[in-house]
């Protein structure tokens, strides 16, 4: 049955992965979280990497949007606030480097 669906093009991991990444990026999730969820669903690492690479240009923009929406773009005033913001952004699936760049005001650096 599954083989028939695959042969007819009704089941396609590439299309599923594309749509999954697109949906999760729109929800404000980062590459780490998206990759982990796809791996849990049994998607091949190479396919995950290629789909995340296609969305790569927008990660910092997406991170800034999430940060502004949640924290109003306020730079942390103390260590405790910085840790709270960083924890939230890491939970959303962004890398430590990406989070650090946003919280240090260096989000535009490549």
What are the functions of these language-model segments?
Residues 1-110:
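An alpha-helical, amphipathic repeat domain used for nucleic-acid recognition
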